[in-house]
Regions:
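Structured, solvent-exposed hinge/loop segments at the ends of secondary-structure elements
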Residues: 22-148, 152, 161-166, 348, ...
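Transmembrane alpha-helix boundary and packing residues in multipass membrane permease domains
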Residues: 19, 23-26, 142, 340, ...
Length: 410
């Protein structure tokens, strides 16, 4: 019982660490509400403007809505594209100045609601028809609506956004800060002037651009199409040229594209994850291998008797692996539960980045990331690997002994 308990706890420890990595990966990169189209999206989050003749003149920043309009929207492979700002602190209140709140607000465009799927509790999303009206239209989160009006039925009401009267046209369910691109508490539309091109500076802005492809197979065509249009734009510029620095990025590159002047090192990222998983698998497996070897030494005589009655080495190894698999699966279930607790306890640390530091929202975890079939399948696969590594070698060594040696327990 003691060895079995230690074996279960050892397996649980390994599975806890492995599945914490898997769940974190799922939360950052998988198709999860509201960012349900990550696998079909490409992203632009950096822009480099350089002098044509004077290469020492450089300006690094973010792309603009005008860049999206000129170089991305016309491509036939693009189903939708949106330009949005990072959620920033804003002040909202009732029109009489009461119930003042600090909120996280972003400005975007109508295509935002085609790419990101937020759940509307009241009203609807804004469209091009609302752009440029007498009063700006906004969408707010349920928590902001409740704090301002005491109810989520706030569509049609007015409030102050940074001391400007705006009209609320929709209320959405709160989303987690872990939704890197979609997260905000108030969504408004940027001014149509941002779409106009007046010079090279028009392509430099403060936007991140998400591009929804019809299928991931269209990614190469979109990349080539954007590169061609950038080349055409540069041909028309006199002193400057724009450089998209090997963008667009897929979701993994996008999340890890921290600096505007340096792209992400994806091979190193994958290598780090691979080394971490290898070490987490290997070290507990070696310890469990020693425990399994101790159990095998206690069963040498039993194995000798079974071989004497005709059991083959392969049959004995399979039986031992099956017996050990029960303990491994128990440890796997315990480890999976512990991994949920660990990720929940460390969620703020795991998912805080340069964009969401100081945000007012909650770092809640998606049920899709925690309870997706992929998580359970991977947990089972890692259990099988640990079982094979920890019990396979001792079982093979034990069955290699002759019948006489086994019966004499030498």
């Amino acid at each position: 019982p003691l060895l079995s308990t230690i074996s279960i706890l050892g397996t649980a420890f390994a599975i806890t660490m492995i599945m914490a990595i898997v769940i974190t990966w799922q939360t950052k990169y998988a198709d999860l509400e509201p960012e349900v189209n990550r696998s079909r999206c490409l992203y632009f989050s950096a822009m480099h403007v350089q002098g044509k003749e004077n290469k020492d003149w450089n300006n690094f920043g973010k792309p603009s809505a005008a860049f999206m309009k000129e170089c991305i929207q016309p491509l036939p492979e693009v189903e939708a594209c949106t330009a949005f700002s990072t959620a920033d602190v804003a002040l909202v209140s009732l029109t009489d100045g009461n119930n003042r709140l600090k909120v996280d607000a972003m400005s975007t465009d109508p295509d935002f609601w085609k790419i990101f799927k937020l759940q509307f509790l009241d009203g609807k999303s804004f469209t091009e028809a609302e752009r440029g009206g007498d009063m700006q239209s906004v969408v707010i989160s349920a928590s902001v609506a409740r704090k301002l009006f005491g109810t989520t039925e706030a569509a049609g009401r007015q409030m102050l956004l940074n001391r400007e009267v705006v009209r609320i046209i929709g209320v959405v369910k709160d989303i987690s800060v872990t939704a890197k691109d979609a997260y905000a508490q108030v969504w408004s539309m940027y001014h149509s002037n941002e779409l106009n091109v007046t010079g090279w500076w028009s392509y430099n802005g403060n936007r991140t651009i998400a591009v929804l492809a019809r299928t991931p197979d269209d990614f190469p065509a979109i990349k080539q199409g954007v590169e061609k249009r950038v080349k055409d734009v540069n041909a028309g510029l006199e002193q400057r040229q724009i450089d998209i620095m090997e963008q667009p990025d897929n979701i993994v590159a996008h999340v890890n594209h921290v600096w505007s002047n340096i792209g992400p090192n994806l091979p190193m990222l994958y290598l780090q994850y691979g080394i971490a998983l290898f070490i987490i698998l290997l070290v507990p497996s070696l310890n469990l291998c020693g425990l399994s070897n101790s159990r095998m030494q206690q069963r040498v005589s039993e194995l000798g008797v079974r071989k004497a009655f005709g059991a083959t080495d392969g049959t004995l190894v399979r039986q031992i692996l099956n017996e050990n698999l029960v303990l491994t699966l128990i440890g796997g279930v315990v480890g999976l539960i512990f991994s949920y607790l660990a990720v929940y306890a460390m969620r703020t640390w795991l998912f805080t980045n340069s964009d969401n530091i100081g945000t007012a929202g909650d770092f809640s975890l998606s049920m899709g990331a925690l309870f997706s079939p992929a998580v359970f399948v991977l947990a089972f696969v890692f259990c099988l690997l640990i079982n094979l590594l920890s019990a396979g070698l001792p079982a093979w060594l034990a069955t290699r002994r002759t019948i006489v040696d086994s019966l004499n327990d030498k």
